[in-house]
A protein has these predicted regions:
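FAD-binding core of flavoproteins
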Residues: 1-73, 182-184, 191-199
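Conserved catalytic-core motifs characterized by acidic clusters
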Residues: 13-16, 38-53, 77-93, 151, ...
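C-terminal helix-coil-helix/basic helical segment that borders enzyme active sites and/or dimer interfaces
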Residues: 79-80, 84, 88, 104-137, ...
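Alpha-helical scaffold segments that form or flank carboxylate-/histidine-based iron centers
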Residues: 91-102, 128-137, 165, 170
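Glycine-rich phosphate/cofactor-binding loops in nucleotide/flavin-utilizing enzymes
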Residues: 153-199
Protein backbone atom coordinates (compact mmCIF):
# COMPACT_ATOMS: atom_id res chain seq x y z
CA UNK A 1 0.00 0.00 0.00
CA UNK A 2 1.57 3.24 -1.14
CA UNK A 3 1.11 6.52 0.69
CA UNK A 4 -1.42 8.61 -1.14
CA UNK A 5 -3.51 5.63 -2.31
CA UNK A 6 -7.14 6.79 -2.44
CA UNK A 7 -9.04 5.50 0.58
CA UNK A 8 -5.90 4.93 2.68
CA UNK A 9 -5.33 7.09 5.77
CA UNK A 10 -2.65 6.95 8.46
CA UNK A 11 -2.22 9.02 11.60
CA UNK A 12 0.09 9.08 14.61
CA UNK A 13 -1.25 7.80 17.92
CA UNK A 14 -0.37 10.05 20.87
CA UNK A 15 -0.73 9.77 24.65
CA UNK A 16 0.59 6.21 24.94
CA UNK A 17 1.50 4.79 28.35
CA UNK A 18 3.44 1.97 26.74
CA UNK A 19 5.94 1.62 23.87
CA UNK A 20 6.63 5.32 24.15
CA UNK A 21 9.99 5.07 22.38
CA UNK A 22 8.36 4.08 19.09
CA UNK A 23 5.94 5.71 16.71
CA UNK A 24 2.53 4.06 16.60
CA UNK A 25 0.11 4.83 13.80
CA UNK A 26 -3.53 4.17 13.12
CA UNK A 27 -4.40 2.89 9.66
CA UNK A 28 -7.72 3.03 7.81
CA UNK A 29 -8.55 1.40 4.47
CA UNK A 30 -11.73 2.32 2.63
CA UNK A 31 -12.32 0.85 -0.84
CA UNK A 32 -8.59 0.87 -1.61
CA UNK A 33 -7.57 -0.54 -4.97
CA UNK A 34 -4.17 -2.19 -5.04
CA UNK A 35 -2.38 -2.48 -8.38
CA UNK A 36 -1.37 -6.02 -9.36
CA UNK A 37 2.35 -5.16 -9.28
CA UNK A 38 1.99 -4.39 -5.54
CA UNK A 39 0.67 -7.87 -4.69
CA UNK A 40 3.02 -10.29 -2.95
CA UNK A 41 4.29 -12.90 -5.43
CA UNK A 42 3.36 -16.58 -4.96
CA UNK A 43 1.15 -15.85 -1.96
CA UNK A 44 -2.39 -17.03 -1.40
CA UNK A 45 -4.46 -15.50 1.39
CA UNK A 46 -2.96 -14.20 4.61
CA UNK A 47 -0.23 -16.85 5.01
CA UNK A 48 2.34 -14.72 3.17
CA UNK A 49 1.97 -11.46 5.07
CA UNK A 50 1.43 -13.28 8.35
CA UNK A 51 4.54 -15.41 7.76
CA UNK A 52 6.70 -12.59 9.09
CA UNK A 53 4.98 -12.97 12.45
CA UNK A 54 7.06 -16.04 13.30
CA UNK A 55 10.30 -14.06 13.11
CA UNK A 56 8.81 -11.18 15.10
CA UNK A 57 7.38 -13.54 17.73
CA UNK A 58 10.71 -15.34 18.00
CA UNK A 59 12.47 -12.02 18.66
CA UNK A 60 9.84 -11.06 21.23
CA UNK A 61 10.46 -14.35 23.04
CA UNK A 62 14.08 -13.31 23.57
CA UNK A 63 13.40 -9.61 24.12
CA UNK A 64 10.90 -10.24 26.90
CA UNK A 65 13.63 -12.10 28.77
CA UNK A 66 15.83 -9.00 28.61
CA UNK A 67 13.10 -6.97 30.31
CA UNK A 68 12.62 -9.75 32.87
CA UNK A 69 16.36 -9.85 33.65
CA UNK A 70 16.47 -6.07 34.11
CA UNK A 71 13.57 -6.27 36.58
CA UNK A 72 15.10 -9.24 38.39
CA UNK A 73 18.54 -7.60 38.65
CA UNK A 74 16.96 -4.39 39.95
CA UNK A 75 14.90 -6.28 42.55
CA UNK A 76 17.87 -8.40 43.65
CA UNK A 77 20.17 -5.41 44.15
CA UNK A 78 17.43 -3.47 45.91
CA UNK A 79 16.60 -6.40 48.22
CA UNK A 80 20.25 -6.82 49.19
CA UNK A 81 20.76 -3.13 49.99
CA UNK A 82 17.36 -1.98 51.35
CA UNK A 83 17.40 -2.40 55.13
CA UNK A 84 14.33 -2.61 57.29
CA UNK A 85 13.34 -4.14 60.64
CA UNK A 86 16.41 -4.53 62.85
CA UNK A 87 18.60 -3.06 60.09
CA UNK A 88 18.47 -6.29 58.08
CA UNK A 89 18.31 -6.32 54.27
CA UNK A 90 14.86 -7.23 53.00
CA UNK A 91 16.55 -10.04 51.05
CA UNK A 92 16.72 -11.87 54.37
CA UNK A 93 12.91 -12.26 54.43
CA UNK A 94 11.43 -15.54 53.22
CA UNK A 95 8.78 -14.00 50.97
CA UNK A 96 11.33 -11.79 49.23
CA UNK A 97 13.61 -14.78 48.64
CA UNK A 98 10.63 -16.76 47.31
CA UNK A 99 9.90 -14.03 44.76
CA UNK A 100 13.55 -13.80 43.71
CA UNK A 101 13.83 -17.59 43.41
CA UNK A 102 10.66 -17.75 41.30
CA UNK A 103 11.91 -14.97 39.02
CA UNK A 104 15.33 -16.44 38.25
CA UNK A 105 13.91 -19.96 37.83
CA UNK A 106 11.30 -18.79 35.32
CA UNK A 107 13.83 -16.61 33.48
CA UNK A 108 16.26 -19.53 33.11
CA UNK A 109 13.41 -21.80 31.93
CA UNK A 110 12.49 -19.12 29.39
CA UNK A 111 16.12 -18.90 28.23
CA UNK A 112 16.24 -22.67 27.77
CA UNK A 113 12.99 -22.60 25.77
CA UNK A 114 14.32 -19.77 23.59
CA UNK A 115 17.61 -21.63 23.06
CA UNK A 116 15.77 -24.83 22.11
CA UNK A 117 13.49 -23.02 19.65
CA UNK A 118 16.53 -21.21 18.22
CA UNK A 119 18.29 -24.52 17.64
CA UNK A 120 15.18 -25.94 15.96
CA UNK A 121 15.06 -22.79 13.82
CA UNK A 122 18.72 -23.20 12.82
CA UNK A 123 18.04 -26.79 11.72
CA UNK A 124 14.92 -25.79 9.78
CA UNK A 125 12.70 -27.83 12.11
CA UNK A 126 10.90 -25.08 13.98
CA UNK A 127 7.12 -25.12 13.86
CA UNK A 128 4.79 -22.14 14.29
CA UNK A 129 3.49 -23.74 17.51
CA UNK A 130 7.03 -23.74 18.98
CA UNK A 131 7.22 -20.01 18.31
CA UNK A 132 3.80 -19.50 19.90
CA UNK A 133 4.91 -21.38 23.02
CA UNK A 134 8.04 -19.23 23.20
CA UNK A 135 6.24 -15.91 22.80
CA UNK A 136 3.36 -16.86 25.09
CA UNK A 137 5.53 -18.29 27.88
CA UNK A 138 8.32 -15.73 27.92
CA UNK A 139 6.12 -12.64 27.77
CA UNK A 140 3.89 -14.01 30.55
CA UNK A 141 6.83 -14.79 32.83
CA UNK A 142 8.46 -11.44 32.06
CA UNK A 143 5.28 -9.60 33.00
CA UNK A 144 4.93 -11.59 36.23
CA UNK A 145 8.62 -10.99 36.97
CA UNK A 146 8.05 -7.24 36.62
CA UNK A 147 5.09 -7.45 39.00
CA UNK A 148 7.07 -9.41 41.60
CA UNK A 149 9.99 -6.98 41.26
CA UNK A 150 7.62 -4.08 41.81
CA UNK A 151 6.35 -5.81 44.96
CA UNK A 152 9.90 -6.18 46.29
CA UNK A 153 10.63 -2.49 45.74
CA UNK A 154 7.39 -1.46 47.44
CA UNK A 155 6.58 2.21 46.82
CA UNK A 156 9.90 2.62 44.99
CA UNK A 157 8.67 0.09 42.43
CA UNK A 158 6.52 2.72 40.75
CA UNK A 159 9.02 5.58 40.50
CA UNK A 160 11.18 6.33 37.49
CA UNK A 161 14.39 5.93 39.49
CA UNK A 162 13.99 2.24 38.63
CA UNK A 163 13.20 0.52 35.34
CA UNK A 164 10.39 -1.72 36.55
CA UNK A 165 7.27 0.27 35.62
CA UNK A 166 8.72 1.13 32.21
CA UNK A 167 9.24 -2.55 31.51
CA UNK A 168 5.87 -3.48 32.98
CA UNK A 169 4.03 -0.95 30.82
CA UNK A 170 5.84 -2.14 27.71
CA UNK A 171 5.28 -5.81 28.56
CA UNK A 172 1.54 -5.18 28.86
CA UNK A 173 1.61 -4.17 25.19
CA UNK A 174 3.96 -6.99 24.19
CA UNK A 175 1.53 -9.41 25.88
CA UNK A 176 -1.05 -8.29 23.31
CA UNK A 177 0.78 -7.54 20.08
CA UNK A 178 1.92 -10.17 17.58
CA UNK A 179 -0.86 -12.37 18.96
CA UNK A 180 -2.41 -12.35 22.42
CA UNK A 181 -1.75 -15.23 24.79
CA UNK A 182 -5.25 -16.50 23.99
CA UNK A 183 -4.44 -16.64 20.27
CA UNK A 184 -1.21 -18.51 20.98
CA UNK A 185 -3.14 -21.02 23.08
CA UNK A 186 -5.43 -21.62 20.10
CA UNK A 187 -2.44 -22.04 17.77
CA UNK A 188 -0.90 -24.59 20.15
CA UNK A 189 -4.28 -26.24 20.68
CA UNK A 190 -4.76 -26.71 16.95
CA UNK A 191 -1.27 -28.19 16.65
CA UNK A 192 -1.79 -30.76 19.41
CA UNK A 193 -5.39 -31.70 18.54
CA UNK A 194 -5.39 -31.26 14.78
CA UNK A 195 -8.63 -29.29 15.18
CA UNK A 196 -8.87 -25.57 14.47
CA UNK A 197 -10.82 -23.52 16.99
CA UNK A 198 -10.51 -20.39 14.84
CA UNK A 199 -13.89 -20.94 13.15
Amino acid sequence: MEKGTPGFKAWDVHGKWSLRASVTSGLAFSDCEIPEENLLPNVVGLKGPLGCLNQARYGIGWGALGAAMACYDTALQYAKTRKQFANKPIASHQLVQEKLAWMITEIVKGQLLALHVGRLKDRGKVDFSHISMLKMNNVAIALETARKARDILGANGIVDDYCIMRHMNNLESVYTYEGTNDIHKLIIGEKITGISAFV
